[in-house]
């Protein structure tokens, strides 16, 4: 059999951009994009992407050139996930919530050939260019503005415009053949910068092959059927929308784009467009719960929600499902090209009590098909931990959907791939049924008197306490045990008023600590509760625990006697944003 050679017919490089061509041919009458009054079919989206790719090629943008974009969830942002790699270039989607200094640092590192930016961000663009030119007076970074597609715009002769590029593009048959035939599936398709919750963000290089396999694994793991209606509550800049930018094309789905994630907008779009799927971080659950919920009982099925980014407490999942959403938990990393674990529902779970079902659903789940293996290993011995749901270790993985590495950072790449695995830095356990469950980030583990305390486990208990909207638990200093848990809590609106706020919070803190003592081993219970109006979050909605740790460092843990008695005293309460 060794004499059977690879050829053009049986050795085609894998790339998710082929999903676009297939969608235009297989679903010609299907709506691809909805944005306000704008509607596109799949053939129209295909044509627009081909024209944009042709224009980029005419600007001498090609293989391995970086194309940066700062834009919200709009048709342009979606189209660029195809058009940029079709031109042979590498898409660099940038978090729109970053400030000019952070974006300038990314551009300085990525060195893009061109920058696309949403028109309403023009002041931000000018500030970014000023920062870049202050270091390099010879800088010549072309900027293309993306206007609101639903509204007329005036484009000066000196200004470049996204829609003009599409109109000018001339995709000849020769160019079209080139666009969908990449030479090497290991070539980069996307450059994604990590969220930077721990330190300076790193540039993650994703390959065509990795994106293709991760996309297929995601739509299979989520059991996404043909022609879904997908609501873009998750930013497309966040790990390419967890690969569903390409996944919706693979399924011939409809992308409902929305700029602002608010409860009224979400519920309006669900009703108006009969949305079937959406992704979000758990903080969006609180937006849904605080908003005026929609009666979804008349629908033929629930809205399927894939959530990740941080472990959602079972109590929170239960509340959201009662609104008419069917929640599936996933776990992933930018370095792994999106989700790598899906909590696949098992039929035997249907016979369990609701609370137990929610506990199982809150786990991270089983590995995607695109990975060779996921394991939980002792960081010191590199041996697999027992599958007992108790013994903690680091979550590691390997497979063809893993990143190529960090751009211009060989040291970080080496550390990430040490011991032949992608090391996640997340601490978890494996249950007897093979499901992985995150217990914490390694840096968030609290070590009290030599005992490891999972902040996530403590948070899960606090979330079950009435009127708790959000919580985060971090370490605070303790004179005897070194560290002890400190809980930061956001209460539901209206839980306290200005007149008796102080007294109520004192009572709340006392009751909450006592509740934890009834449901957790005493060494795991918070010695301090700090009430906030809002938890600090980064642009992706992840809670910024380093900021909370900074506050906790200045607090004093009480001894065991005072924890039990909880005498009346002023309660720490921080207002506004951190």
From Swiss-Prot:
Keyword Membrane annotated: no
Descriptive protein name: Probable acyl-activating enzyme 12, peroxisomal
General function of this protein: May act as an acid--thiol ligase that activates carboxylic acids by forming acyl-CoAs.
Signal sequence region: none
Enzyme Commission no: 6.2.1.-
Alphabetical list of Gene3D superfamilies matching this protein: 3.30.300.30, N-terminal domain of ligase-like
Source organism per UniProt: Arabidopsis thaliana
Family note: Belongs to the ATP-dependent AMP-binding enzyme family.
Primary site of residence: other
One GO BP annotation of this record: fatty acid metabolic process
Subcellular location field: Peroxisome
Tissue: Expressed at low levels in leaves.
Gene this chain is encoded by: AAE12
Gene Ontology molecular function: any one: ligase activity
UniProt xrefs under Pfam families: AMP-binding, AMP-binding_C
Keyword field: Fatty acid metabolism, Ligase, Lipid metabolism, Peroxisome
GO cellular component, one term: peroxisome
NCBIfam families: PRK08162.1
Motif (Microbody targeting signal): 576-578
